[in-house]
């Protein structure tokens, strides 16, 4: 048997023996499935203003409206289903995380590789910038950047990129 296949089978045997790891993997794939297929899984579209009924505002969890739709987590002040809002919010969160992570990886890898290639004063300068940035708490720095730029998904992506690139450059 190929040593790589043997190693992979050994890993899977050890992994599948750990019940917590299997449960975490199942939850991960469930969240990923819900995020990717939210329009098909969610009961309603929270962004579709024609389906939102103000008469259904602030319903408690498990309530039904006049048409018989059950709101398992209730509704918000505008009458939107909270389960649907969570499912659609997962899509946005997953997109922000993946996109900002990939862009930060690209920028950080560029500066890290270029610093290693050119050496000397350029490497010292880039690594001091990285050291200065890594000396601040990431969440605090991201909140300061968002406070300076304003709120919004695009500003959040920019803040995450500006905070994360240094980890990849190091």
Language-model regions: role of each:
Residues 72, 103-110, 116-170:
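Generic hydrophobic transmembrane alpha-helix motif, especially the helices
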């Amino acid at each position: 048997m190929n040593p790589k296949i043997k190693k992979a089978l050994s890993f899977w045997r050890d992994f599948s023996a750990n019940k917590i790891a299997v449960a975490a993997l199942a939850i991960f794939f469930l969240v990923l499935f819900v995020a990717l297929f939210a329009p098909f899984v969610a009961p309603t579209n929270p962004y579709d203003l024609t389906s939102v009924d103000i008469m259904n505002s602030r319903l408690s969890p498990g309530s039904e409206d006049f048409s018989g739709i059950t709101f398992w987590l209730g509704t918000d002040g505008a009458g939107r289903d909270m389960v649907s809002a969570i499912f659609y919010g997962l899509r946005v969160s997953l997109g922000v995380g993946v996109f900002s992570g990939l862009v930060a990886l690209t920028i950080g890898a560029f500066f890290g590789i270029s610093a290693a290639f050119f050496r000397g004063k350029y490497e010292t300068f880039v690594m001091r910038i990285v050291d200065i940035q890594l000396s601040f708490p990431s969440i605090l720095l991201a909140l300061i950047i968002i406070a300076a730029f304003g709120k919004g998904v695009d500003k959040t992506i920019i803040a995450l990129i500006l905070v994360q690139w240094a980890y990849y450059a190091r």
